Amino acid sequence: MFLNDNFLLTTDIAQTLFHDHAKSMPIIDYHCHLDPQEIYENKHFPNLTAAWLYGDHYKWRLMRANGIPESHITGDASDYDKFLAWARTVPKAIGNPLYSWTHLELRRFFGVTELLNEESAPRIWEVVNRKLATSPFQRRNLIKNANVKVICTTDDPADTLQYHQLLREEEQAFQVLPTFRPDKALNIDASGFKDWLGRLEQVVQKPLNSYASLVSALKQRIGFFHEQGCRLSDHALDVLRYLACDEAEPEMIFAKRLAGETLSPDEVTMYRSELLTALIGFYHEKDWTMQLHIHAYRNNNTPMFRKLGPDTGYDALNDLPLTEALSQLLDRAESGQFLPKTILYSLNPKDYPALLTLMGCYQKETVGKMQLGSGWWYNDTRNGMREQLTLFADHSLLSNFVGMLTDSRSFLSYTRHEYFRRVLCGLIGEWVERGEAPDDLAMLGQMVEDIAYGNASKYFGFSSVG
């Protein structure tokens, strides 16, 4: 039966591992894109479209593939008409994880077991909207009811973190912690770089008229983020290049950019390489974990990018080389004894063996110091998860894996943790069935509990956050 108690669990051992060990473990969502202001204000969603379809480019891509007009995806159609357009799309999504996720979310959050389609949509709309108007379905209660203990948002160095501070004072059931994401500091060639620099100046209350002053300001913000509970950084390295240079070079490049001159590709790479290296040292000082998200190829549809902006469903994966540049970056940090705990993600799964074998060169003392990140974005599927888990086990110690994250903008996405846990238990159960792993429930049960929750709790050190 569809989505029965044992879906994705094809062996007895898998069923036992999930139901007795994985299912009840709390959730640490250590990388997501929820808005901390929305969490703090704790408002009701006005309807299911607002909770489900706003900002969800996963769904938008499927709707476009189904010929839905843009007016009913991101345009000015009513929320109800947008919901009906999604309901027309869902029956065609069998085999896509969104088919399972859609119905898991309806079941786990709203108790709706009916399949979503054009005929059932009006009934589901009414049932869910009535529930969304009640207290148990406010944003914070959705988080609590999903058994979430830690949420790490994604935050710019110039952000004030005011809502993190307010949540820290008021919310006892779960933590909402910032993540330091300094992409705008690194993207010196971006058109908005000088405007962003002005925002950072306002926050640090001093002029940023030199490279040295920028580095100092970022170090200051890292200290502030740490005080607010931050224990991770994150970087979008869509194209990974590395060029070392002498100490004077970044200062000259920075001055050239402020003067409005065009930078050469090599100058951009040198600046980014030096600034990222400096940041890595600061992360190490704070015992943070650094996340590197590699090989997204963004904003491919120029007309739609001009119309809708970024993060609207027009990104793909990249296939450029990465080993040499990444090795140079990691080796420079290791040689200087300031390589922090690191999680490496690639949007292109062909990169997994390269990342895994490279990270094995830098394991040291800390258990699982270097990690291959959970299947990211387009790899957040049953097959993608199994590939990531299998290759992790092939090249490292899967028992030390820090597990799943949502990487989501949706308050209803926590069922992805259940989906991941079922895939994990199913895979281990297959290993036992084939004689590749012992039928030792105590050992395997502990492994599953660790990957679901325990490893992340220890690795990131959230318990030290007051």
Q: Which residues are covered by each model-predicted region?
A:
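Metal/cofactor-centered catalytic core regions of large enzymes
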Residues: 267, 313-316
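Short, basic/hydrophobic alpha-helical segments
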Residues: 329-335
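Short glycine/proline- and charge-enriched loop/turn segments
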Residues: 305-313
